């Protein structure tokens, strides 16, 4: 961290529980919880598409979320909202907000507070691999929860809505969608139920509360997530991440992240892979931070971090 970064970090350590970071073009709002105990690195919890950092602060049924759980474990916790999400400003061209632009804003946050553990979910996975390669001094470890792989691993899908629609049930491709980039994408409730709130662990009695938390998404981000037209976020060389501790965690009820897909991402990146049923944890879908055993999975991640001395 340079002198300016160190000064900023000292200021943040005395700041109230929220602040703004990111790039000039794409500022991001950040919640800050807890205080670091000796020897424990801060952790940054990054949400996926259609969500905000609120998914880490509390669960849909009102229990404490992963952010307070990590704070109780003795870590300083930072929870950003992507640009244009939650309390982060939305520009008029939000529909074409790219993965790289979001990653650059998150990279700026890590440069201010790092080195840190970076925990990512779903569509923020490709951003984590990119940030770790671009700014390795800021990322001490990565925990990927059902994370998207780098586009290096994804087949190039045609930039054709009709052709992609024929692949929408192909779990090996992540059940892809292709959307027009002339307006933000509003996620319909039936999509949420099919892919995000589908598991037996999801608190279905709180689905309406969850639905109200979902925000419009950049159409370009969605297309990049499925490597439509080969425009997904790539890394230059997985060897650049070979010395980085990486954990990938996946449940058995996530149609967009079957075991084979996330295991392949782990092999490519040299990561440790946890298929939750092998730890006696069954029934989790795409949103384990919201599900009824969220504390159990948070404890698994905390134990991994502590075993690594992070």
Task: Show where each model-derived region lies.
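Active-site glycine-rich loops that stabilize anionic/oxyanionic intermediates
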Residues: 47-60, 122-123, 252-253
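Glycine-rich "HGGG/HGxG" loop immediately N-terminal to the catalytic nucleophile
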Residues: 54, 80-96, 282-283
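Conserved alpha/beta-hydrolase
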Residues: 61-90
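Conserved acidic catalytic loop of the alpha/beta-hydrolase fold
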Residues: 100-117
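Conserved hydrolase catalytic core segment
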Residues: 115-156
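Catalytic histidine-centered segment of alpha/beta-hydrolase-like enzymes
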Residues: 279-294
């Amino acid at each position: 961290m340079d002198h300016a970064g160190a000064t900023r970090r000292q200021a943040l350590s005395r700041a109230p529980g929220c602040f703004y970071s990111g790039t000039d073009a794409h500022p991001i709002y950040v919640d800050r919880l807890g205080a670091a105990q000796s020897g424990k690195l801060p952790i940054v919890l990054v949400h996926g598409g259609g969500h905000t950092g609120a998914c880490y602060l509390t669960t849909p049924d009102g229990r404490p979320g992963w952010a307070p759980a990590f704070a109780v474990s003795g870590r300083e916790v930072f929870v950003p909202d992507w640009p244009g999400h939650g309390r982060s400003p939305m520009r008029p061209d939000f529909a074409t907000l790219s993965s790289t632009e979001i990653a650059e804003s998150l990279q700026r946050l890590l440069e201010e507070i790092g080195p840190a553990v970076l925990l990512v979910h779903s569509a923020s996975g490709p951003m984590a691999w990119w940030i770790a390669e671009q700014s390795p001094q800021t990322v001490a470890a990565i925990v990927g929860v059902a994370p998207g792989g780098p586009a290096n691993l994804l087949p190039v899908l045609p930039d054709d809505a009709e052709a992609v629609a024929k692949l929408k049930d192909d779990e090996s491709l992540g059940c892809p969608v292709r959307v027009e980039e002339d307006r933000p994408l509003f996620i319909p409730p039936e999509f949420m139920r099919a892919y995000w709130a589908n598991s037996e662990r999801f608190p279905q009695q709180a689905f309406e509360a969850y639905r109200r938390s979902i925000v419009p998404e950049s159409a370009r981000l969605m297309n990049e997530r499925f490597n439509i037209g080969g425009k997904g976020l790539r890394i230059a060389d997985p060897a650049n991440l070979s010395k980085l501790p990486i954990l990938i965690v996946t449940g058995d009820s996530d149609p967009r992240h079957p075991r084979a897909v996330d295991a392949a991402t782990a092999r490519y990146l040299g990561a440790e892979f946890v298929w939750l049923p092998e730890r006696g944890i069954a029934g989790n879908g795409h949103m384990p931070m919201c599900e009824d055993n969220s504390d159990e999975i948070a404890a698994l991640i905390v134990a991994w971090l502590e075993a690594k001395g992070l």
